[in-house]
Amino acid sequence: TIGMIYVGPKDDFGYNQSHYEAAMALKGMPGVKIVGEENVPETQAVQKTMQGMISQDGATLLFPTSFGYFNPHILDVAKKNADVRFSHCGGMWDAAKHPKNVGSFFGYIDECQYLNGVIAGHMTKSKKIGFVAAKPIPQVLRNINAFTLGAKSVKPDITCSVIFTGDWSMPVKEAEATNSLADQGVDVFTMHVDGPKVIVE
């Protein structure tokens, strides 16, 4: 049994949905059972969810997918459940510091954001590009830098304005941030939030 825990809705057309679709692909494999819970905040609630999946559903592998789930939540539950494997999406794991039943994975999104920046550099007429992001954590900052450097490789005098919404799934704030940047002359946008509403708006 594999447990999937999502910080937002599993149909957000973005981060959570990509994990959900991967879980559904696994579900089709013989002998694999998937349990999942969506909209689990980065609080004690995720510890209750993880422990419930272990105790009630028999999960032996958990994918708590949000950045803020790692410390202290995954670490605390992992210490109490040595026979369960925890795989965290966030690149926070350190073999020297963390339990052996914990690991992490993360994609090289910054490489794609660099290419997005190159495209933005060719597309912008105002030489003002924008980035709407959830939180100023290392992975997000790396993406902002990559996007900006990609754009500057095309037009060195481009500026990139950034607005942080404070959380991963805040569609209203994301739309407000995008509109605010547009009012400042930004004409090309990207994001590092869970869903693509900011781009659609």
Model region roles, listed by residue range:
Residues T1-E201:
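A residue-level marker of the well-folded mature domains of exported/periplasmic proteins
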